[in-house]
Amino acid sequence: MILKRISILNYKNLEQVELEFSPKMNCFIGQNGMGKTNLLDAVYYLSFCKSATNPIDSQNVMHDQDFFVIQGFYVTDEGDPEEIYCGLKRRQKKQFKRNKKEYTRLSDHIGFVPLVMVSPADAELIAGGSEERRRFMDVVISQYDKEYLNALIRYNKALTQRNVLLKAEVEPDEELPCGRR
């Protein structure tokens, strides 16, 4: 899948950007603070439904604006066009669409536009602990294996619930609540 064109409105410091890409290689050159990293982050957002640099969606809206929109126009290996749309208004639910059809679950989109980002922060993959390496591998594998992604989501939810119970300091004789949420 090749990203042919991107349209960005009010994303971080990018007020309005329309770019067409070469299918081979694209270079971005500019002074510090011009938005090169934010452009790459917008491309990342279209793949992962979130920013690589800021997990709080509302903080990715340009200062003094109420919303952002990112649209990517792709061509599949078979030559079919695909449009990915993301829009966020402050204090509202994020909209993520493929060919104008909204996703019911964002996890359904993960892996549709495969992407691996390598940055200077990834030096921690080598020098750091195993947690960073596991997280990186989880991201890569989740794009190609939906069952792995769903299992990872369930595992993280169970881990969070376990940690809440451990912090609750329940007396040994007390009955633990059970059931589904």
Predicted ranges, named:
Residues 23, 34, 38, 55, ...:
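Generic alpha-helix structural propensity
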Residues 24, 42, 112-114, 136:
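ABC transporter nucleotide-binding domains
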Residues 124-181:
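An accessory alpha-helical subdomain
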Residues 48-132, 141-144, 148:
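Nucleotide-state sensing region of NTPase/ATPase domains
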Residues 45-48, 164:
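Regular, well-ordered alpha-helical segments
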Residues 1-45:
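Pre-Walker A-like glycine/lysine-rich segment at the N-terminus of P-loop NTPase domains
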Residues 36, 40-41, 57, 137, ...:
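Alpha-helical structural signal
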